[in-house]
Amino acid sequence: YIYSLLLILSKKKIDSNVIHGDPKLSNFLFDIQYKYVVSLIDLDTVSSGFCVIDLADCIRSISNLAGEEPENIEKVVFDINSVKYFLQGYFSIFNKNKSYSFRFLPEFIYLIIFELTIRFLIDFLQSNRYFEIKYETHNLFRSEVQYRLLTSFLVQIPKLSNELHDIGISSSSTFVSDVQKFV
């Protein structure tokens, strides 16, 4: 699937836009009183890229209610309800028909979680050169968190596909049906 996604990107079937580049939950400022997002912060990552990948990374972050550094790793799950409400809000503002790329959202969520799992693991194996750490096995722990999120996500793909369908986006049926065979 990674090769297929890269092929889609290389054939320019997905539009490039200005993206945030790191839309994790901790980079959102919230108005607590009115309960809405005021702004994205940490703008050093803004660049040209693919909106669907930024959206996938945002979903990766908001779906894990235990957080990036949970006290109890057992609580790491892909929370489909958080994603459902986020997508309803997102697509109530953003024109879902504007981009062909949204049909590949499950694949890109898979890709971003898988990529982070591997990046944290590689950094741990290479003596923690890239990501800042608080303790020696910090990146190994981060990799485990992402791996747990990935395995939970795989189980939730059919539900995610249904949620996308409910808001008018047909997801790529091949990926969803292939995942169902293995889960």
What are the language-model segments listed below?
Residues 1-20, 25-39, 129-134, 148:
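ATP-dependent phospho-/nucleotidyl transfer catalytic cores
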Residues 1-8, 43, 61-64, 92, ...:
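Conserved helix-loop functional segments at active or binding sites
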Residues 15-20, 47, 109-114, 142:
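Secondary-structure capping and boundary motifs in well-ordered enzyme cores
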Residues 26-67:
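Catalytic activation segment of kinase domains across protein kinase-like and atypical kinase folds
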Residues 52-95, 111-130:
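Active-site activation/catalytic loop segments of kinase-like enzymes and analogous catalytic loops
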Residues 97-109:
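All-alpha amphipathic helical-bundle segments outside canonical DNA-binding/catalytic cores
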Residues 115-183:
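ATP/Mg2+ or Mg2+-diphosphate-binding catalytic cores
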